[in-house]
Amino acid sequence: MVQEYDVIVIGAGHAGVEAGLASARRGAKTLMLTINLDNIAFMPCNPSVGGPAKGIVVREIDALGGQMAKTIDKTHIQMRMLNTGKGPAVRALRAQADKVLYQQEMKRVIEDEENLHIMQGMVDELIIEDNEVKGVRTNIGTEYLSKAVIITTGTFLRGEIILGNMKYSSGPNHQLPSITLSDNLRELGFDIVRFKTGTPPRVNSKTIDYSKTEIQPGDDVGRAFSFETTEYILDQLPCWLTYTNAETHKVIDDNLHLSAMYSGMIKGTGPRYCPSIEDKFVRFNDKPRHQLFLEPEGRNTNEVYVQGLSTSLPEHVQRQMLETIPGLEKADMMRAGYAIEYDAIVPTQLWPTLETKMIKNLYTAGQINGTSGYEEAAGQGLMAGINAAGKVLNTGEKILSRSDAYIGVLIDDLVTKGTNEPYRLLTSRAEYRLLLRHDNADLRLTDMGYELGMISEERYARFNEKRQQIDAEIKRLSDIRIKPNEHTQAIIEQHGGSRLKDGILAIDLLRRPEMTYDIILEILEEEHQLNADVEEQVEIQTKYEGYINKSLQQVEKVKRMEEKKIPEDLDYSKIDSLATEAREKLSEVKPLNIAQASRISGVNPADISILLIYLEQGKLQRVSY
């Protein structure tokens, strides 16, 4: 008997688990198929979650009802807030994961999720009827039927590991690759590209001389990604910093001809922002040294990840490199680094919901869409799961805008601009980064998560209480006038401020650069009554109010452009006035509104003006079929 589901998820990596959980949590009967049940949420590369921009994505996933934040909060070995000396727009949390515990915890969550079924199996083929997906067929001929399918195959599609002059079919960490499914996507007409990524050697902790390295401890205060976490792991393990040197670079230079990167063996495009050590040596040969972070892979293993030493050089050369690095001279290499090539689809073949334009009800998420990173994958998986379930259950899909979330920036970049290399999310990619902060992800997205059925009533009530406390405290400080008495003047001067000439509202005093919420309470002779996250919001929203309001005005302008919809089936070849390049790009991307059209590379303001004229005159309808 053929089994039927609402949604099938192919793959159980970081995109797959979020897709499966989101679909199930929205009420869809969901099946997750994966090559190996023991590798659910596996971390084949760095054992970490978060960092600049990426850490904010993890907070956004949590605010929308996803899982990654909760799981890393329970299984990390270290957590640090980055960029604390800078403004709130670029602060981000980063955690070192216990990669085995992370996998185990995520597998437990998936097994306990109602509506989510998991099965070990390799999908070889999609079942398609009239350009609509109807299910999948495995390598042993088993068929599973569904109303929607989400492909989250990571780097497994026609995966090939490259090490020196060796090249062989493999998924990450020497797992089985998925070859036939990649061929099936080509046969269906998808435009496929070849990308490459890599990983460094792992060494035995017992053989490292840590006295020659610099300790990198975690923060000594409780940190968490999830807004629901209340218990913090304070027993943390340190990381360690060391460097390459002239000796290391000589080993690389002497053996560069053996690197698959430079021998011509690697055809795929590698990630610009995570280059291999040989690539760094060639591109930045004026630098006398490069940072290397020694990151423990967990509490119950001796394996240490040498962050920054990603390489495809032969194993014996990797050993020679390690022997030149302070602290690693006698290190025992437990796993060699390698490069991996894999297939990805050109992401402009997707709608902003992550549904493919070519095949109805077929979605893709994660590295198959050309991204790099666990967090980028998880964010896409979450949205694909939300949208696939919403479509088949008729409960609504959701497109995050660039002003809603970094996840919105990520997806819009992919489907509007595409990518010719593994895409990494950066704070510089977000034009509204002062709005898209680590601290306010819940204020931006919890309402949305609740409307989508991803947030419980209890959690939503707590969130609303927090929001009301923030608003009430800002109003309270706006009504309190501080007198310029000696008590006040002494505290202000003590903190580097200039004396008051007249009375001032507490909220206006807080706007001064040297003032903090703590100092205001000291002046008012009050005790702390609110949670730290509420106080943080009061301070940030007050100090940056002018900048935030400017950003919100820009958002409103874009929203007006987003309201100018473009029919999906518009035939741009009928609009004679458009430039040839614009016509080609618009036909490829099929933007849903004028705002998206304006972000397409090759579409200039004159082309947008022509589209606007057609919209206003109603001519778009006459050239649509």
Curated annotation (Swiss-Prot):
Main localization (coarse): cytoplasm
UniProt key word Cytoplasm: yes
GO cellular component: cytosol
Binding site for NAD(+): 270-284
Protein name, entry field: tRNA uridine 5-carboxymethylaminomethyl modification enzyme MnmG
A GO MF term: flavin adenine dinucleotide binding
Keywords: Cytoplasm, FAD, Flavoprotein, NAD, tRNA processing
Originating species: Staphylococcus aureus (strain bovine RF122 / ET3-1)
Residues noted as binding FAD in the record, renumbered to the chain: G11, A12, G13, H14, A15, G16, V123, S178, Q367
Purpose of the protein: NAD-binding protein involved in the addition of a carboxymethylaminomethyl (cmnm) group at the wobble position (U34) of certain tRNAs, forming tRNA-cmnm(5)s(2)U34.
Family: Belongs to the MnmG family.
InterPro entries: FAD/NAD-bd_sf, GIDA_C_N, MnmG, MnmG-rel, MnmG-rel_CS, MnmG_C, MnmG_C_subdom, MnmG_C_subdom_sf
GO BP annotation list: tRNA methylation; tRNA wobble uridine modification
NCBIfam families listed in its UniProt record: mnmG_gidA (TIGR00136)
Keyword Cytoplasm: yes
Subcellular location: Cytoplasm
Cofactor(s) demanded: FAD
SUPFAM superfamilies with a match to the protein in the record: FAD/NAD(P)-binding domain (SSF51905)
Assembly with partners or alone: Homodimer. Heterotetramer of two MnmE and two MnmG subunits.
